[in-house]
Amino acid sequence: MNSEICLSCEAIERYIGEEEERVHALRGVSLEIEAGSVHAVVGPSGCGKSSLLYILGLLDLPDAGRVSIDSEPVSHLSDDELAQKRNKSIGFIFQFHFLMEDFTTQENVMIPMRKLGELSDNEMRQRAADLLEGVGLGDKLRRPSRHLSGGEQQRVAIARALANDPRVILADEPTGNLDTANSERAFELLQNLVHERGKALLLATHNPAIAEASDWIHEMKDGRIIASHPGGAQSSTS
């Protein structure tokens, strides 16, 4: 396994709510995600999967513990610094694609690039075209996203997650809104991109087939990681 750690957390604690409704959502969670690897987090609804992804994605702050990207602690950064780190270093994929329906596929992929503001308009258009070509949509650059199938829309979301060449991709039920065939295609595409480009992918899923096809599986219960073991992808290469 590649020993280069892209994303890690140590002893994460998170409480949600107030007083009698206060919930201990994460309890001492520690995790390391290597470059070029796919890690799946599984467990029942309410076990803390989404809370963990929000903290690792710098969308929420832990009450205790530390998050690091490329071995650099980030939990102490200001809101503006966290936003910059998030935009540059982390790509997000969700169960629902959240595309702008009236934007073309190319324009949707360009949105994170515009937010980061490091490329010219021509450079953004070319990068978006290259990414869409990589997910098999190079012939639909100018098609409004509302005219795409569900599987195609999720492929646009995958391309958008790669827009700023992030080190880390976080995916919350990325295939949960797709049928079985499109789920398998979307995951295989994402898995290949991660392995080929040396990204680190952490996904939360209820799909046992996708979890088993990952490199590592982390089982969560009641806010804790109770077990971690190699998935089928890791076993097949060892």
Model-derived features with residue positions:
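Short coil-to-helix segment of the ABC ATPase nucleotide-binding domain corresponding to the Q-loop/switch region
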Residues: 103-112
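ABC ATPase NBD coupling module
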Residues: 20-23, 74-91, 121-122
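Conserved ABC transporter NBD signature motif
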Residues: 65-73
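Conserved catalytic motifs of ABC-family nucleotide-binding domains
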Residues: 165
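Catalytic Walker B motif of ABC-type/P-loop ATPase nucleotide-binding domains
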Residues: 169-172
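The feature captures the beta-strand-to-loop junction immediately N-terminal to the Walker
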Residues: 42-44
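Conserved ABC ATPase signature
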Residues: 144-154
